[in-house]
């Protein structure tokens, strides 16, 4: 397993590669036993993340592998379908995957997402427009949503999707 780090305005991002695929993207420390280095996958990932952070790239196209429970994998797949600049509630994701009463479980699955940004769990918010949690911290979530063009204060009052969820 090889990792690299990159600095962003929100903090340091760690990218981990194994067998030609990204297996972790997070604000956490590298896993024990991982060696710091560079290879084609990590170099391309850094290039794409830099373009994303500059607002030039809206969809990351990188090889990845993530493993979780069947429920987690369904949640993560649903999160990858949320378009750039849009949000969904935990309840909406729960209904989308066929478990309408599992909003909290969706939140837990999002928290355990090993591939921040590739599986954009920052795009999931609470039903009343509150941000909810984020494994990398609320500062990261706020920064990522603002980067994608979300006005976090105006959205609560003017976003038709959020307004419709309240009624």
Language-model region placement:
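Short glycine/serine-rich loop segments
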Residues: 101-145, 152
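Basic nucleic-acid-binding alpha-helical/helix-turn surface characteristic of O6-alkylguanine DNA
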Residues: 1-101, 147-167
